[in-house]
Amino acid sequence: MDSSAVPANASNCTDPLAPSTCSPAPGPGSWVNLSHLDGNLSDPCGPNRTDLGGSDSPCPPTGSPSMITAITIMALYSIVCVVGLFGNFLVMYVIVRYTKMKTATNIYIFNLALADALATSTLPFQSVNYLMGTWPFGTILCKIVISIDYYNMFTSIFTLCTMSVDRYIAVCHPVKALDFRTPRNAKIVNVCNWIISSAIGLPVMFMATTKYRQGSIDCTLTFSHPTWYWENLLKICVFIFAFIMPVLIITVCYGLMILRLKSVRMLSGSKEKDRNLRRITRMVLVVVAVFIVCWTPIHIYVIIKALVTIPETTFQTVSWHFCIALGYTNSCLNPVLYAFLDENFKRCFREFCIPTPSAIEQQNSARIRQNTRDHPSTANTVDRTNHQLENLEAETAPLP
């Protein structure tokens, strides 16, 4: 997300009193879109920079490990992109493919996987952007990439917040959960989360644009005057509504759930149901905890840079990119967590990767049952054909 749109009135990039307006962009997008909360997507000090030399050069000394940083970032982004896209699409596939996976919790997981898949799909653009030190993809893709990052940030945390409330209802109010926790309601809530996220995603899409700066093209956000006010207001709003408030809601929900689980030995009257309930609750808790761990550094970093001037050093640049990479890494971790923490996901992943004869037979029978429901006349024909084949086999079978 373009963290640092360049103010229109910035005139002297050597002015020590205004370093935030001239500091080099953090790479693939400071909040890039992670980077868009603190910088544009283009890094004038990237590996292909033009070092003007002298005190007025916006780049650090030539000896800085920009090429090593670029290679490391591209390698990390490539891994996150491949694992994230494959893993999240696999999660969505098994939820759509297997009827037993269409539970309320898994519908929320589908929404989370969709947001993560969209976010990881932007990484190739960001890698090229950082390597070239300019944004070569045009204004339309600039708008799409930046808005996807904001959509992912808000939709992911809203979905995790919804999952925590859903777990709270399942554990603390099991009777009410029977009416509320349905796949249909979960789909409606998912749509609402995307609509609410549009409150920030759509404005950001209109604000995103490309600008020429120092011989390169930046993919950045533009703000009205005074620029510093609207830019910092955006950062603070994102920090509050996409991090602080959801984390507080999640903390309260899990605090109440822990008290409930400690005070009651059996929640549903069945040991098996209780075991599944606790297992799912534990899985959601781990997913939420990993999300908070991965996203806390970038949120803290951005809010500090909005309030305090941080000198541009190699350590600052490396730590900034580490925070960005950590945020994107979360998008590829969730499928791994599901595979280790949920037996149903683990079984479905195994059947997808290594199909067994029994699994293939189950899939074929499921297709036949679906065709039976959709085409009754065809189903009757299939039944007659099967009956004729059975008679033929009986007639041609060797005598004992």
From Swiss-Prot:
Intervals, Extracellular compartment: 1-68, 132-142, 208-230, 307-314
Query: What name goes with this protein?
Result: Mu-type opioid receptor
Keywords for this entry?
Cell membrane, Cell projection, Disulfide bond, Endosome, G-protein coupled receptor, Glycoprotein, Lipoprotein, Membrane, Palmitate, Phosphoprotein, Receptor, Transducer, Transmembrane, Transmembrane helix, Ubl conjugation
Protein source organism? Saimiri boliviensis boliviensis (Bolivian squirrel monkey)
Q: What is its main location?
A: membrane
What PANTHER family does its record include? MU-TYPE OPIOID RECEPTOR (PTHR24229:SF7), NEUROPEPTIDES RECEPTOR (PTHR24229)
According to the entry, what is the taxonomic lineage of the organism? Eukaryota, Metazoa, Chordata, Craniata, Vertebrata
Transmembrane segments annotated in the record for this chain: 69-93, 107-131, 143-165, 186-207, 231-255, 280-306, 315-338
Into which family does the record put it? Answer: Belongs to the G-protein coupled receptor 1 family.
What gene name does this entry carry?
OPRM1
Recount the PTM note: Phosphorylated. Differentially phosphorylated in basal and agonist-induced conditions. Agonist-mediated phosphorylation modulates receptor internalization. Phosphorylated by GRK2 in a agonist-dependent manner. Phosphorylation at Tyr-168 requires receptor activation, is dependent on non-receptor protein tyrosine kinase Src and results in a decrease in agonist efficacy by reducing G-protein coupling efficiency. Phosphorylated on tyrosine residues; the phosphorylation is involved in agonist-induced G-protein-independent receptor down-regulation. Ubiquitinated. A basal ubiquitination seems not to be related to degradation. Ubiquitination is increased upon formation of OPRM1:OPRD1 oligomers leading to proteasomal degradation; the ubiquitination is diminished by RTP4.
**InterPro entries in the record:** GPCR_Rhodpsn (IPR000276), GPCR_Rhodpsn_7TM (IPR017452), Mu_opioid_rcpt (IPR000105), Opioid_rcpt (IPR001418)
Per its database record, what is this protein's job?
Receptor for endogenous opioids such as beta-endorphin and endomorphin. Receptor for natural and synthetic opioids including morphine, heroin, DAMGO, fentanyl, etorphine, buprenorphin and methadone. Also activated by enkephalin peptides, such as Met-enkephalin or Met-enkephalin-Arg-Phe, with higher affinity for Met-enkephalin-Arg-Phe.
Q: What positions carry the motif NPxxY?
A: 334-338
What residues show lipidation of type S-palmitoyl cysteine?
C353
Question: Which segments sit on the Cytoplasmic face?
Answer: 94-106, 166-185, 256-279, 339-400
